[in-house]
Each structure stands twice: as structure tokens, then as C-alpha cells.
């Protein structure tokens, strides 16, 4: 009597169905640490092909958020892929440690306690180290393989000295200057801001149309009126429009476009000048229905005419500027060189300079109009309206909601404010034209990044690099007390400072005096107390790779890749590009990838106010880092990325699909020893040869998608391979021989050999993304020589590559197309409850001669392809009326009959009664032969 269960090779494995990632991942991290994985990956690899990804430094403040996780995971996927492709790809994580946010946190902690600057910097430094350690541990928990023992902080002495060394090169080129210019200014920061430190949000403002009365002069008389009429001149006003009424006291000119046409319009007894295209729009707003056009003229004709300020006792000129548009307002713009960059440029041509009547806190300081003194510019705009009404200079006003710049840290409105600052000149020596040409040669992903960078650089003013703060890298300049000029030996002095800072840090600058560095005429110079823009620091850090990796070709070092969020076009990408082009005349990167922002399920940005933040730490604790990594890879990260608990659950389903496939593969090779049981390729069944060739094909496509950084397509291919090629096809077709044939039969060992190879492929495919799961798989694989999956490369078996199956992919594609068509008919019969299982079927095929001969090749194995108990082939012409015609295959009809034969309790096939042994546990002759290894050998499957 045969024990049926014991006679079957039922699948079993130690590889768990439940991943328990949150626990298992920590074990794997300990293993990586124990074997010193990062060092092992890079030991003796410097002669390999090289790939350098430059880390955009996150800010050393607070817990990592989901955006940090996206960024670091993407970088990690790329670097793991590159290392598995044979590249030397080191990764040194960087951190930005200076800047306002840290200063403000320390100021809040200190409250009103006063300490000196030296102590303040020490406290900032201690805080930074704690933050970096916290973030570092969070990044390690994500599975990021990096040189965690050699991280790069902007506070490192080498970084401080390198930043000043780069600045010295720019000074040497004569591109640094000091000027009184309008820059972004935050009242709370009490400092200038970089463009990358502002964000635009909607703000309610008062928009006003103001009358600036023209002063009678000969230009008007000679140009426009033959008959001089003093009454008309006394009543002509030029209308200006502004959304910043607080700037009216600082107005020093009115700009019009020299090439556009303006009109003098009569309304009742008054005359107004405004641009031709906007006349109707302006008067409609003020509900004016009747007006008369007196004359038209080009803007250039009234240059230098003067107007009265609407309430200050001053006269202001009309000037020309091409930036004035006919799309908005009146075509006349009041010019405040203190509070607008375009205003400053236009006024500079007429030698009109800023007057600085708004202080650093936002209060007016006007000698000529004391009513506004000590009033904050944002709090008393209504006061300006009142004054204008009182002086009968307000033509019209309304409240509008418009996009306005805000401080990214304080979330409060900022202004342009003229202050003495240090700038890098970006206008000299065709700098922008040369940079445009280099931008074209860089690979931008997405491609729109190229035009975005070009547009931003085109309109970018000179770079303000000075900040009026404490916590930062110093601007080590000495300026003349009277002239404000840099010391003539500045470059030489800075080179000395660089050497000292490399050994002692920048404290040596802060704690020194003028005499330390200048011996002659030291009493006529003073130290600059400003610090450098943090974007200059991070922009200069690409040159540190040279020192960290001992790169031989130092002069021409270029990073292969920069990868950051899309906001970094105006931030780190731009600062790095400018610095590299100035100092080395080459871009710092060959490729730039940007990822989108993380949104919630409703498409809203993550924010504290909306309470929609999802912490990466909580996701890891609940689901594991591999789920988070899979979510990052699964989405097209070049767009904004959505996350929610529902989305993560869908990602978990996809993870289970991959894991269950791998578990099933393991369960079918539980008794397989590669060194004993492996079957040579040429002796394997043709179906097994097919799946190996198919797997190789998938690997080529997957590697290509990895190399194109299209990870969502990598994942889709892996899932497709697991679900379709394996789940719906190969693994279904081999079940019979896997379970029912003798455990040492060539048929079974052949499919086990194929499964063994598939696992070798699959574990490598998922490794860059599902790093912990891949390591878990690797630990259970036989014949592994390396301690970690990441110490291997893409699977290449010479025996498999050289050999080609007699029955190639095209051959099997044809048979699987037929199988797919037949399955449609079988599924219909299942739905109709005619059958429960396809093995109940006798399949009758009525087919054309060509197809008949093709299927005849399979002989008795045909039923195993269609997973039925019996298959019969007939000529197409003999098809009965009940046979159903295929819609996809020509001359192809199918008839399905339910078998009346007996079901074998072991293999579940239906066979004739006389094919069974007459005993209590009757099993079919096929099963007996399989057990005794006397069966006819399979060729195909």
C-alpha cells in the first residue's frame, strides 16, 4: 500500500511567508556592520570603472521627513546598482550645518540669556552634532549603504578651509565686490536671504492707482502744444499702479517704456497719462464711463519731465526702462531703488541711489515726513491710503490676493531692501553664455530641467553671498575704513587664512584681530563680520570629493550625478554650477536628476498645519524599510509622489507578490544541492531552457531600466516576471513533474536547476530596491561565495550564455499564444460551472495543417502544456458544429468535453480504469512509473 502524501515531493521551505521586516531588518543591519560591508565593497576597487554621486547635503536640524527618505533611497538604489555593475561607487553622506534655522533654535533655547558669540557658536556646534547623529541613524535604518564613519559636515575644518579656498579663487578673478543693492530681506532673520530661501505664498495686499502731478516745463510745451495752456499743465497727472503702497515714501522716479505709446486722457477737468493698451481697463475699474483722448505719444518723448511726490515735498523725474510692461497696471511704474532690483538697475542709469529709509526691522525712518516714523511698513498701509486721499492723489484702490515672497523659515512676507552686501559678479566675460552652452551638454532628468536652469540663470542677478549672522563660515575680508575697498593683498591674506583654518577651524578668524593678518597699515582696515551664504558652502562642496577619495584627476573632477528635489534647480544645482564654472570653467556634474515633492492621497503637500505628515520612522516600525523603499521605486519619482496608508497597503500587496513567488521557488528546491543535482543546460528539458533564456532577457531589460534610472519600470518588470512568466506560466507547468515524479528524476532536477538559476537572477534584480529582503534570500541560497548579496554582480553563467535552446523564445511564444486562447475557453466553462478544474477536460482541437504539425511535436506532452487530462488533434475540416471558432487564430476550433474517466488521487489526472492498480489506494500507472522511475522521459516539459 502506497502512502500518497509521502510519495509526493510536496513543497516545503524555511523561508517564512511573513516577512517580519521591522525585526529582521535590524538583524541584517547588524550583520552589515559586523562584516564592515561598505569597506568590503570598495576595497581594491579603485581601478574599476568609477561612478560618483555627489550627495546634496540635508540640513542638520530635526528628524528626517518623508522627503529625506525619498532622496536617500533613490541615491542608494542607484549606487547599489552601479556597484553590482562593477563600478567603484563610494558614497560619503554630507550635511549642511550652518545657517539661520539653527541660530533661531539656539536663540529660543537661550531665551533672554545673553552670551558672547564664541559661546553661541559652541552651543550651535553641539546641537548640530546631535542632529547629525540622529539623522544618520535614521538613514542607516533605511538600508542606506554609505561611509558612515567618514561623513562630511560643513563644520569640518577641511570643509571650512575648502570653502574659503574656493572663495579665494573667485576673489583672485576679480569677481567679488561690495555694493549697496536691494536684496531679499527678512525682518525676523535680520539678514539677507538667497533666492533659494524664499517661497511664494498668497498674500492679501492693497493695490492702488496714484496720481503723480506733472510739473510745468518746456518739454511738454514744445512737444505737445502749439498753444500753451497753463490750465491744462496744472492738471496733468501720470497714473502709476502698485501692490506695495508702503514703498510710496521711498519712490524716487517714475519709469515708462520708451517704445510704447501713451495717451493724455481728459476726465472732467483733469488730465491723466497712461499706456494706450490699458486705458479702458483702468477706467472701467474706477467706474469711469466717459473720457476723451487728447493725444498719443511714445514714452521716450517725456523723459526727464518731473512730477511732484504725492505727499513728500520732493520732485521726481520720469525715466525710461524697457522692463515696464503693457500687460498690467498703467504702463508707468514708481521706482524705489531701495526695494526693487529692476528699480535699482533703472535708477542707476540716472545716478539715482537708494536712500535707506526703511530700517532692518521694517520701520520707516523719514526725516522729511515724521508722521510715518516708527511705523512698520506692513502694519500701516492704510495710513498711506489715508494720506493719499487727504492729498487728493488716490485715483483708485482695491484689495487683491497675489503671490508674494515669504521667508521659507519664518513663513512671513519679506521685502527687497537695499543694504551694503558682498556680491559675485555674474555678468563679466560672457559667463552666462558659456554656462548656457555647458548646460546643453548635461543630461537632465526630467528633460525640462535644462530650460528651467537656463531661464533662471538668464534672469539671475549678481549673487549676494554675505549674511549678517553669527553661525556660519566667515567672509575673511579686510576693508579700508574710509573707502570700503578690499585690502590690496586680499588673495595672499586669504591663502594664509585657508591654511590656518584647515588645522584650527574658523575660530582662528573669529578670535583674531586685524594685526594677526596685516602688519602694515593695520589701523586703517577693519575685519568684515559677515558670514557666507550657506548655498555657497554647499555649492563649493563638490570639490571635496577630490580629497575624500584621493582622485588622481583633480583638475577635471566632475560628479557623474546630482540627485535632489526639484526645488534645487535654484538652490544647490545653481550654486554648484556657478562656482564650478567660475573656478574651473566646467560644470560640476554630468547628469542631474530631480524628484518631485511628497503629497498626501488628496494631492496636498505634507505640512504640520494640515496634519497630513507621515513619518518614515513610523512606516518602518510598522511595515519595514523595504516597504518604504518599494514605494519610492514603484512611483515615477520625477513627478510629485503621493503617499497614504492606503497607498502603502497596495505597495505591501506588491511586496507580498514578490516574496510569495520567491518563497514558492525555495519550497521547490528544498532537497536540491547545486553541487550534486545541477543538470547541464543541454540536458535540461526545453521548457526549462526557455525560462532560463527568458530570465536572461528580463535581466537585460531590467539592467537597462536601472541604468536609465526608471525604477518604477524595473519594479513593474519584476512583478510581471513573478506574476506572468512564473506564476501564470512556468510554475504552473512544472507542478506535475515537481510533485509527482521521482525526486531524482532528470525532469524534476531539470526544473529545480532552472529554479535555482531563477533565484540567482531574481535576488540580484531586487537587491538595489528590496535590499533587506534580498539579503535574507541570499542568506538561504546555496553555493554562495560572498557574505552579502551586495558583494556580487549581475548573474552571468557562462554555460547558460553560450548555449542556445533548439526551441527558442519564438517557438514558445507561439505555443503560449495558443495556450492563452485555450485558457479563455476553459475559464468560460468554469464560470458556466461545467467543470471545476481543467484536469477534468478532454480537449479536442480542430486546426489547420501547419498548426497540426507544430503541436504534433509535443506528442504526449501536449496535455501538460494545456493542463488537461487529454488532448486530441484533428483536421480543421472535421470540426463538428459544436466546436467553437477562435477569434484570434485562423482555422482554429475548440471543443471541450468533460472526462468520464477516473481521477487519480495522486496526480489528479483522469485516466482509464485499467490504468489503475487494484488496491486500496489506487493510483494511475503514470504515477507508479514516476515513483519507480520507469516512465517515458519528457523532452519538452
From Swiss-Prot:
Belongs to the class-I aminoacyl-tRNA synthetase family. IleS type 1 subfamily. SUPFAM superfamilies: Anticodon-binding domain of a subclass of class I aminoacyl-tRNA synthetases, Nucleotidylyl transferase, ValRS/IleRS/LeuRS editing domain. ATP binds at residue 608. It comes from Buchnera aphidicola subsp. Cinara cedri (strain Cc). PROSITE patterns: AA_TRNA_LIGASE_I. This is Isoleucine--tRNA ligase. Its EC number is 6.1.1.5. Gene3D superfamilies: 1.10.730.20, HUPs. Signal peptide: none annotated. The gene is ileS. L-isoleucyl-5'-AMP binds at residue 564. Zn(2+) binds at residues 904, 907, 924, 927. One of its GO terms (cellular component) is cytosol. Catalyzes the attachment of isoleucine to tRNA(Ile). As IleRS can inadvertently accommodate and process structurally similar amino acids such as valine, to avoid such errors it has two additional distinct tRNA(Ile)-dependent editing activities. One activity is designated as 'pretransfer' editing and involves the hydrolysis of activated Val-AMP. The other activity is designated 'posttransfer' editing and involves deacylation of mischarged Val-tRNA(Ile).
Amino acid at each position: 500500500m502506497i502512502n500518497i502524501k509521502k510519495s509526493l515531493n510536496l513543497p516545503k521551505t524555511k523561508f517564512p511567508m511573513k516577512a517580519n521586516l521591522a525585526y529582521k531588518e535590524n538583524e541584517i543591519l547588524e550583520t552589515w556592520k559586523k562584516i564592515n560591508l561598505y569597506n568590503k565593497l570598495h576595497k581594491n576597487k579603485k581601478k574599476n570603472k568609477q561612478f560618483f554621486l555627489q550627495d546634496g547635503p540635508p540640513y542638520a536640524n530635526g528628524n528626517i521627513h518623508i522627503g529625506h527618505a525619498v532622496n536617500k533611497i533613490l541615491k542608494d538604489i542607484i549606487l547599489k546598482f552601479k556597484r553590482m555593475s562593477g563600478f567603484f561607487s563610494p558614497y560619503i553622506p554630507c550635511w549642511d550645518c550652518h545657517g539661520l534655522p539653527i541660530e533661531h533654535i539656539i536663540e529660543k533655547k537661550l531665551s533672554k540669556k545673553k552670551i558672547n558669540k564664541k559661546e553661541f557658536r559652541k552651543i550651535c556646534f553641539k546641537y548640530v552634532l546631535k542632529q547629525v547623529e540622529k539623522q544618520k541613524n535614521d538613514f542607516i535604518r533605511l538600508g542606506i549603504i554609505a561611509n558612515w564613519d567618514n561623513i562630511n559636515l560643513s563644520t569640518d575644518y577641511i570643509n571650512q578651509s575648502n570653502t574659503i579656498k574656493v572663495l579665494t579663487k573667485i576673489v583672485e578673478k576679480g569677481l567679488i565686490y561690495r555694493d549697496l543693492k536691494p536684496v531679499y530681506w527678512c525682518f525676523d532673520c535680520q539678514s539677507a536671504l538667497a533666492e533659494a530661501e524664499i517661497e511664494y505664498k498668497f498674500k492679501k495686499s492693497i493695490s492702488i492707482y496714484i496720481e503723480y502731478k506733472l510739473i510745468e516745463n518746456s518739454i511738454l510745451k514744445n512737444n505737445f502744444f502749439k498753444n500753451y495752456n497753463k490750465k491744462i499743465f496744472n492738471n496733468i497727472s501720470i497714473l502709476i499702479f502698485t501692490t506695495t503702497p508702503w514703498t510710496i515714501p521711498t519712490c524716487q522716479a517714475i519709469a515708462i517704456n520708451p517704445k510704447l505709446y501713451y495717451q493724455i486722457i481728459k476726465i472732467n477737468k483733469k488730465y491723466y497719462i497712461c499706456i494706450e493698451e490699458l486705458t479702458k481697463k483702468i477706467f472701467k475699474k474706477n467706474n469711469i464711463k466717459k473720457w476723451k483722448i487728447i493725444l498719443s505719444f511714445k514714452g521716450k518723448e517725456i523723459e526727464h519731465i518731473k512730477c511732484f511726490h504725492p505727499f513728500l515735498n520732493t520732485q521726481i523725474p520720469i525715466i525710461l526702462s524697457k522692463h515696464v510692461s503693457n500687460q498690467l497696471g498703467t504702463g508707468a511704474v514708481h521706482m524705489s531703488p531701495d526695494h526693487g532690483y529692476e528699480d535699482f538697475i533703472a535708477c542707476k542709469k540716472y545716478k539715482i541711489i537708494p536712500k535707506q529709509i526703511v530700517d532692518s526691522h521694517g520701520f520707516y525712518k523719514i526725516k522729511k515726513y515724521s508722521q510715518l516714523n516708527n511705523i512698520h511698513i506692513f502694519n500701516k498701509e492704510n495710513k498711506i491710503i489715508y494720506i493719499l486721499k487727504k492729498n487728493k492723489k488716490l485715483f483708485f484702490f482695491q484689495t487683491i490676493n497675489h503671490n508674494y515672497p515669504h521667508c521659507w523659515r519664518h513663513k512671513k512676507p519679506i521685502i527687497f531692501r537695499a543694504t551694503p552686501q558682498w556680491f559675485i559678479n555674474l555678468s563679466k566675460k560672457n559667463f552666462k553664455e558659456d554656462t548656457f552652452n555647458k548646460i546643453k551638454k548635461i543630461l537632465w532628468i526630467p528633460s525640462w530641467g535644462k530650460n528651467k536652469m537656463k531661464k533662471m540663470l538668464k534672469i539671475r542677478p549678481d549673487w549676494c553671498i554675505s549674511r549678517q549672522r553669527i553661525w556660519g563660515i566667515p567672509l575673511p575680508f579686510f576693508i579700508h575704513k574710509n573707502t570700503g575697498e578690499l585690502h590690496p593683498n586680499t588673495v595672499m591674506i586669504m591663502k594664509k587664512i585657508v591654511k590656518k583654518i584647515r588645522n584650527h577651524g574658523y575660530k582662528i578668524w573669529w578670535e583674531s584681530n586685524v594685526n594677526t593678518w596685516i602688519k602694515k597699515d593695520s589701523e586703517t582696515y577693519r575685519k568684515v563680520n559677515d558670514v557666507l551664504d550657506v548655498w555657497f558652502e554647499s555649492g563649493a562642496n563638490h570639490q571635496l570629493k577630490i580629497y575624500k577619495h584621493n582622485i588622481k584627476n583633480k583638475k577635471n573632477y566632475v560628479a557623474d550625478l546630482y540627485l535632489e528635489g526639484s526645488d534645487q534647480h535654484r538652490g544647490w544645482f545653481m550654486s554648484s554650477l556657478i562656482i564650478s564654472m567660475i573656478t574651473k570653467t566646467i560644470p560640476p556634474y554630468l547628469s542631474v536628476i530631480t524628484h518631485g515633492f511628497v503629497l498626501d492621497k488628496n494631492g496636498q503637500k505634507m505640512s504640520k498645519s494640515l496634519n497630513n505628515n507621515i513619518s518614515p520612522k513610523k512606516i518602518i516600525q510598522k511595515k519595514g524599510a523595504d516597504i518604504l523603499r518599494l514605494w519610492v521605486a514603484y512611483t515615477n519619482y520625477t513627478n510629485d509622489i503621493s503617499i497614504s496608508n492606503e497607498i502603502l497597503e497596495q505597495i505591501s500587496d506588491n511586496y507580498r507578490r514578490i516574496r510569495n513567488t520567491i518563497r514558492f521557488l525555495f519550497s521547490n528546491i528544498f532537497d536540491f544541492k547545486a553541487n550534486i543535482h545541477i543538470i547541464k543546460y543541454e540536458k535540461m528539458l526545453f521548457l526549462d531552457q526557455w525560462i532560463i533564456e527568458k530570465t536572461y532577457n528580463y535581466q537585460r531589460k531590467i539592467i537597462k531600466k536601472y541604468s536609465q534610472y526608471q525604477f518604477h519600470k524595473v519594479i513593474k518588470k519584476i512583478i510581471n516576471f513573478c506574476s506572468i512568466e512564473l506564476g501564470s506560466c512556468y510554475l504552473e507547468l512544472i507542478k506535475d513533474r515537481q510533485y509527482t515524479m521521482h525526486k531524482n528524476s532528470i525532469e524534476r532536477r531539470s526544473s529545480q536547476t532552472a529554479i535555482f538559476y531563477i533565484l540567482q537572477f531574481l535576488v540580484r534584480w531586487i537587491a538595489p530596491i528590496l535590499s533587506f529582503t534580498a539579503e535574507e534570500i541570499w542568506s538561504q541560497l546555496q553555493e554562495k561565495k560572498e557574505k552579502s548579496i551586495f558583494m556580487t554582480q549581475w548573474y552571468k553563467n557562462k554555460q547558460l550564455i553560450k548555449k542556445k535552446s533548439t526551441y527558442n523564445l519564438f517557438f514558445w511564444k507561439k505555443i503560449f499564444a495558443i495556450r492563452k486562447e485555450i485558457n479563455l475557453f476553459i475559464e468560460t466553462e468554469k464560470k458556466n460551472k461545467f467543470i471545476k478544474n481543467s484536469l477534468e477536460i478532454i480537449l479536442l482541437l480542430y486546426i489547420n495543417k501547419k498548426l497540426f504539425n507544430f503541436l504534433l511535436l509535443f506528442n504526449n506532452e501536449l496535455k501538460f502544456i494545456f493542463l488537461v487530462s487529454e488532448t486530441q488533434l484533428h483536421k480543421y475540416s472535421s470540426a463538428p458544429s459544436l466546436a467553437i471558432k477562435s477569434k484570434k487564430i485562423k482555422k482554429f476550433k475548440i471543443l471541450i468535453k468533460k472526462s468520464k474517466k477516473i481521477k487519480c488521487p495522486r496526480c489528479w489526472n483522469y485516466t482509464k480504469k485499467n490504468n489503475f492498480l487494484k488496491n486500496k489506494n489506487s493510483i494511475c500507472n503514470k504515477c507508479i512509473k514516476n515513483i519507480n522511475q520507469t516512465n517515458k522521459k519528457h523532452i519538452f516539459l
